[in-house]
Amino acid sequence: MLKKLIVTVLAFSLAVCGTACSSQNSSIETTAETPKETTEPAETTESVTETATETEISAGLEYWAENSAAAQSIIEYVKSVTDENSENFVPVNERTAFFDLDGTLYGELFPTYFDQCLMLHRLLHDSTYTPTEEYREYAQQLEDALFAHEPEPDSDKSSAQVTAEIFKGFTPDEYKAYIRDFMSESAYGFEGMTYGEGFYKPMVSLVEYLSENDFTIFICSGMERTILRELTKDTLGEWIPPQNIIGSVFSLESEGQDGTDGRKYNCSQDEKLLFEGNLVSKNQKMNKVFSIFNETGAEPTISFGNSSGDFSMGTYTLRNGGKSYMLLCDDIERDYGDIEKAEEFAEKCAELGFETISMKSDFLTIYGENVTKTETDSVDEEDKAA
């Protein structure tokens, strides 16, 4: 009886084990087949990632081509320095972007830099001002050379020094009002745009994008800083306050100072601040690095320029682990570019480790669709008198 019971129990156990094992094997087989079913969706995920990149460019950088390699590089770099888990992470209080102005944020061929255009207007086309014969002749030769696309005439003084002298005695408010009046003039060589509107729309969107990613934005330009502040206030003032604008410096004096050294003079409450008529420093090349260090104490996280005048700023950025980009003046359809010059500049940038931005290929528009280049290579006498 006991023997029969044992046999029965063993038989029952074997039956149960067989059912369980069969069920387990079936489960294992089903699990093993599962990856085959998810292989195709994995490929779909990869294509979604590529689409998301183009979406990021169009959403984050307005007016940039969706296939722009430069835009892709900028976005990837910004991601790396803003991600706390990245080895490239830069804390918000150290996250800075430095921009040149002329040819980087703003056009420089109207037919020349904005501050030079302002100087020429003052010397040649301002009926309220009578310049010296020497300066009038210099200005006329310079304007003629610019319109003819010829080298600038030689001069004992830089155009910046001349500009400082012809605005001597202006108060800051008078100077800013004069600048703003000129900003309303039509930009030479274009229709549908004033001097105050001559900013590169893709670069303005880049400034906004960097600000949204908690970069502190600076302008570091060779232009005199009061001109810079007034010119950029309407378009860039939302993201770049006056104290973040670095430029060349014109000397100042108090109304009653009369040549007394500033270290030995104290002004009264009713004295006005006046421009004294001299260029103190020109913010170019290595001077840009000195200005960045002295005025901000910052090491650039990212910087943007467009000429050899920005090479030192770019090198300083790279030396501190940042990235530097240079614009190429390679668009001859929408702007007054120079293909040969752009190609040579691109080669030099590659040697120095700078990435380049093609105005022709990377920008969907430059000044806006309502702005057209007039294709003017020279100017007639009626236009010059305007």
Roles of regions detected by a PLM:
Residues 7, 89-91, 238:
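Generic structural signal for beta-strand residues in well-ordered domains
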Residues 68, 169, 286:
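Electropositive phosphate-/nucleotide-binding environments in soluble metabolic enzymes
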Residues 2-24:
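Sec-dependent N-terminal signal peptides of Gram-positive bacterial secreted proteins and lipoproteins
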